[in-house]
Amino acid sequence: MTKKILGLDPGLASLGFGVICTESDNLELLDFGIIQTPAKTDIGKRLQIIYEDLHQVLNTHQPDVVAIEKLFFYRMGNTILVAQARGVVLLVLAQHQLPIIEYTPAQIKLALTGYGAADKVAVQEAVARELCLDCLPRPDDAADALAVALTAWFQR
């Protein structure tokens, strides 16, 4: 059975997405990228951009399931902004009635590298290896989203 998995790495400035398609043990990369919002734009407008662009990603790819990185608290100011963007993401996913799977950063690192405290490069190398890419996926937020999608595939 074919299954499309959308991985999301929520953020306000840059929201990463990655879409993979799985069939049995076969894995195919369909798309990846970022939804970017301008820094000097009103927060409401930035959230609206995420809302509209994520709807477009969902309508284009029509995933069966969405895997999303759980919110990680590290700097209060940034965490609040990410939480606002994440709220919009969850709203859009609910509107599309999509099942959601959430993973912590440590779970994602462990699934891809075997080490829950792996660095970003190790995770990107694992993503590139699993998806047979010639180079590391960029930008970082898109690579992180692919890592989330792959984690969902590994955990099936």
From Swiss-Prot:
Keywords: Cytoplasm, DNA damage, DNA recombination, DNA repair, DNA-binding, Endonuclease, Hydrolase, Magnesium, Metal-binding, Nuclease. SUPFAM superfamilies: Ribonuclease H-like. Its cofactor is Mg(2+). GO terms for biological process: DNA recombination; DNA repair. InterPro entries: RNaseH-like_sf, RNaseH_sf, X-over_junc_endoDNase_Mg_BS, X-over_junc_endoDNase_RuvC. It catalyses: Endonucleolytic cleavage at a junction such as a reciprocal single-stranded crossover between two homologous DNA duplexes (Holliday junction). CDD domains: RuvC. One of its GO terms (cellular component) is cytoplasm. The active site is at D9, E69, D141. Mg(2+) 2 binds at E69. Its EC number is 3.1.21.10. Belongs to the RuvC family. Homodimer which binds Holliday junction (HJ) DNA. The HJ becomes 2-fold symmetrical on binding to RuvC with unstacked arms; it has a different conformation from HJ DNA in complex with RuvA. In the full resolvosome a probable DNA-RuvA(4)-RuvB(12)-RuvC(2) complex forms which resolves the HJ. This is Crossover junction endodeoxyribonuclease RuvC. It comes from Acaryochloris marina (strain MBIC 11017). The lineage of its organism: Bacteria, Bacillati, Cyanobacteriota, Cyanophyceae, Acaryochloridales. The gene is ruvC.
